[in-house]
């Protein structure tokens, strides 16, 4: 039996648990729009679940244009000017923003633009059609983004297991599990590094103080970039404590990401937020547990500002981790934005986590002894709760060169030439996770939103180790991870071969549920130092 087999025979039973399949083509569509580049899938579901308010009211709307290079887009500027539109572009960017009123946008790109009211009461503009690159611009513009003034998003809330007596990993046990205890004993605790948590909600300082006192860690008060965050919901509290458990001497920063989903232009705003964070904290390690919409809602052009800003930060030494998601490979489920019977359209990835330069972090169920010594791990998948590690194939990005060898290890029908996620994993099961303090109570954290800050903390430790031994900050880590996995002096990953999510199975080598596996940090740090010396 091929352990990686992931065809319809595998995931169909899981989807049928909730009902029969429906397809986006069954959604009601206005007759006059048929055959005019209609967008299908989750995007169509979003509009079908919203109230069509008619032609968009006069306002400035926008879409993103991905450019073929970094030169000034003179053709685009002239073309849009002739049609009553404007272009925003900065020197050296490989993307631009086209803006104008809805009528001008509609005429220029031969689309319909209406206003909609969503299920949550939000009002936004959208076109049910995908704008095409005009023939006159095809030498300069490679792709256009969606015309959509709303970004479906979710505020992650940690999966908390309230009835797990005497279980959960202490900070010392967590270090032991991933073989980072030796580095900690040698004084590598993240000193001199910075960990940035991107967040939609706040935290309770009393919980941070109690956590630190309980486990004998230094007290800390995070810095904040942006306006003060609203009331704590648990996610940011967990992220901070988990990162502190691994790297207690690293500086902690919370970045208010909530403005990115207020109004339109979310991905341009995310790119700007990344730039601001890089400017304020160059070389920091980033942890993201925010869902900024699934990849099937977008085009790659929409994410161009995010990808550009991430690359720039990585050139300054930043390493970035993003949770792969907790919907077991079904990240395109509608949630509060639309209702539908489970079907193929649900299969998808978190959009930002799928960017090739972003390190996507999956989740596992962990078994250890009382001291945290690693015994076993398997894929995290809770079928009754429809929760589990995210992962799968990108709808937007081609397979990067550093994943070529890994692609040969997945099932033949999954070798589509597209970016694969996750890249790596850490414990996410809320019944086997890390002890945290929330609202004054000791509970067990969970979700891939726990896995990402674990890796962020471990990377802060590795950065300190590398700098102390003549190395450099890691920066973009993905190519290094895959190179080390394909052959290095020390085994750096524990291969997770058991389990599945709703779409794929784990198996030997790389798989689409846990990636390369979970880390042996002592070995990984030493391999990275060797790789840096060879490259130098």
Regions of interest found by a model, annotated:
Residues 365, 410-412, 463-512, 532:
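An often Trp-containing, charged/polar helix-loop segment at the C-terminal end
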Residues 356-396:
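Polar, glycine-rich mid-to-C-terminal structural blocks
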Residues 1-3, 15, 57-59, 352-355, ...:
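A short, structural micro-pattern
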Residues 25-92, 97-98, 102-360, 394-447, ...:
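Substrate-binding/charge-relay-adjacent region of secreted/lumenal peptidase catalytic domains
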Residues 2-28:
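Secretory targeting and sorting signals
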Residues 16, 453-461:
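Short amphipathic alpha-helical face segments that pack within enzyme cores
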């Amino acid at each position: 039996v091929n352990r990686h087999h992931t065809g319809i025979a595998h995931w169909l039973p899981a989807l049928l648990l909730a009902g029969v399949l429906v397809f986006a083509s069954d959604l009601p569509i206005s007759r006059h729009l048929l055959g005019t580049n209609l967008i299908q899938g989750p995007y169509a579901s979003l509009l079908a679940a919203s109230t069509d308010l008619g032609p968009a009211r006069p306002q400035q709307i926008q879409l993103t244009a991905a450019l073929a290079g970094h030169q000034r887009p003179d053709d685009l500027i002239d073309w849009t000017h002739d049609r009553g539109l404007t272009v925003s572009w900065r020197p050296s960017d490989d993307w631009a923003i086209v803006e104008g009123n809805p009528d001008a946008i509609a005429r220029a790109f031969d689309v319909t633009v209406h206003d909609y009211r969503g299920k949550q009461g939000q009002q936004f503009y959208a076109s049910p059609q995908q704008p095409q690159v005009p023939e006159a611009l095809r030498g300069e513009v490679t792709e256009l983004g969606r015309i959509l003034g709303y970004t479906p998003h979710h505020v992650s809330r940690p999966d908390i297991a309230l009835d797990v007596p005497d279980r959960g990993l202490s900070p010392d046990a967590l270090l032991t599990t991933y073989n980072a205890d030796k580095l900690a004993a040698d004084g590598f605790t993240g000193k001199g590094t910075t960990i940035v948590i991107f967040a939609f909600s706040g935290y309770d300082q009393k919980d941070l103080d109690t956590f630190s006192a309980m486990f004998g860690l230094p007290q800390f008060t995070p810095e904040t970039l942006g306006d003060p965050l609203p009331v704590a919901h648990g996610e940011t509290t967990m992220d901070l404590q988990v990162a502190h458990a691994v790297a207690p001497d690293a500086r902690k920063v919370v970045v208010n990401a909530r403005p990115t989903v207020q109004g339109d232009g979310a991905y341009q705003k995310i790119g700007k937020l990344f730039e601001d964070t890089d400017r304020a904290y160059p070389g920091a390690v980033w942890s993201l547990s925010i869902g900024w919409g699934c990849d099937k809602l977008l085009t790659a052009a929409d994410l161009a500002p995010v990808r550009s800003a991430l690359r720039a930060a990585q050139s300054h030494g930043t390493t970035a981790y993003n949770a792969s998601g907790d919907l077991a490979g079904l990240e395109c489920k509608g949630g509060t934005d639309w209702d539908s019977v489970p079907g193929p359209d649900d299969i998808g990835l978190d959009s930002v986590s799928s960017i090739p330069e972003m390190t996507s972090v999956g989740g596992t169920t962990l078994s250890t002894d009382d001291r945290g010594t690693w015994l076993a791990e398997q894929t995290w998948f809770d079928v009754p709760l429809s929760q589990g590690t995210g992962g799968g194939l990108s709808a937007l990005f081609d397979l990067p060169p550093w994943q070529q060898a890994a692609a040969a290890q997945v099932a033949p029908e999954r070798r589509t030439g597209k970016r694969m996620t996750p890249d790596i994993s850490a414990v996410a099961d809320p019944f086997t996770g890390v002890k945290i303090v929330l609202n004054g109570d000791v509970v067990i954290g969970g979700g891939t939103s726990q896995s990402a800050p674990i890796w962020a903390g471990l990377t802060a430790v590795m950065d300190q180790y590398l700098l102390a031994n003549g190395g450099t900050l890691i920066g973009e880590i993905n190519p290094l991870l895959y190179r080390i996995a394909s052959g290095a002096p020390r085994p750096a990953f524990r291969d997770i071969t058991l389990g599945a999510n709703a779409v794929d199975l784990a198996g030997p080598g790389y798989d689409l549920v846990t990636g390369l596996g979970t880390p042996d940090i002592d070995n990984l740090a030493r391999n990275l130092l060797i790789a840096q010396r060879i490259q130098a």
